Regions:
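Short capping segments at the starts of secondary-structure elements
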Residues: 17-26
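A short acidic, leucine-rich amphipathic alpha-helix
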Residues: 26-32, 43
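Alpha-helical DNA-recognition elements
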Residues: 33, 49
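Non-DNA-binding regulatory cores of transcription-related proteins
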Residues: 57-58, 62, 66-134
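Short, hydrophobic-biased segments on the C-terminal half of alpha helices
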Residues: 44-48
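Glycine-centered, phosphate/nucleic-acid-interacting loop/turn motifs that mediate DNA/RNA or nucleotide
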Residues: 54
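Short alpha-helical segments that sit at the start of domains
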Residues: 1-13
Length: 134
């Protein structure tokens, strides 16, 4: 039986609290508030264990380091903001996506990533483009 140390509880709390998938360095930064001595190696080891046990899944986005989120969230997709690099959950899935496969093919899984700008970055962009009033 695996010991539930303070470090592990802090990592689990970060994953529980944050809706969006996080990189290991992001998890470390957030967990350091609770455990100042926590190291990145511990974070990676525990994420590997959680992934192996099926409690956490890795979110793979091309050109980025893996992100991690709880496995109990069910099937969903992600949105990558090209301006800030943030990754956000999409709550819905395309209806009928499995019917897009060619005849006599079987879809076993799929993953969709939308790319663009998040609400915060769009607001910043809009403010930056507004002329200064003299």
């Amino acid at each position: 039986m695996e010991r539930r140390t303070r470090q592990k509880r802090a990592i689990e709390a970060v994953l529980e609290k944050h809706k969006n998938p996080l990189t290991a360095p992001e998890i470390l930064r957030l967990a350091l508030k609770e455990i100042p001595t926590l190291g990145i190696a511990t974070v990676y080891r525990f994420l590997k264990s959680l992934t192996k046990d099926g409690r956490v899944v890795s979110v793979e986005i091309p050109g980025q380091m893996p992100r991690y989120e709880r496995a109990d969230k069910g099937h969903h997709h992600h949105f990558l903001c090209r301006a800030c690099g943030g990754v956000f959950e999409l709550e819905r899935c395309l209806a009928g996506i499995k019917t897009m496969a060619p005849p006599r093919f079987r879809v076993e899984d799929h993953e969709i990533i939308l790319y663009g700008s998040c609400e915060t970055c769009l607001r910043k962009e809009k403010r930056a483009s507004q002329p200064l009033v003299a």
